[in-house]
């Protein structure tokens, strides 16, 4: 797990990014109108940067269950760093609101540098069991069927490039039916990759 100084450093990076991203959004997006026709500008109790930081800490900390991580680690051991924390259920609702800015934040701020030896591979992101494909609504029209070494699945693929230290250099999400070699044909996926790039067949 990160030291408190590292947590503060990541928060500062995320907060600076969120402020710039909010300015960009303000200039390029239409205002959100509530169903009643009124504009809603009620801010969340937690900032987007705090939500993003907690999500980054979870994925970096080796925890398997987010609920346990949030209730037992964030709410007890990091309570002094998150004085405006919300309930677990509310946090889960807020997570999806910061997904898009978080992906951009990771892509623009947190990616590491290439050392000359890189590895590329993909992993499946299953959204439901195969028996539930026909009643699945959340990713309807986005998720597709795909096949991997473990058989058929329904969802997406995550393509990752890492260096020899295990640090992430780039990533890309695709539908499940995309061939693993397809992202390598896109120049933007291989930006800043130099030297040897190893992959399985």
Regions found by a protein language model. Give the residues of each.
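Short alpha-helical elements
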Residues: 1-201
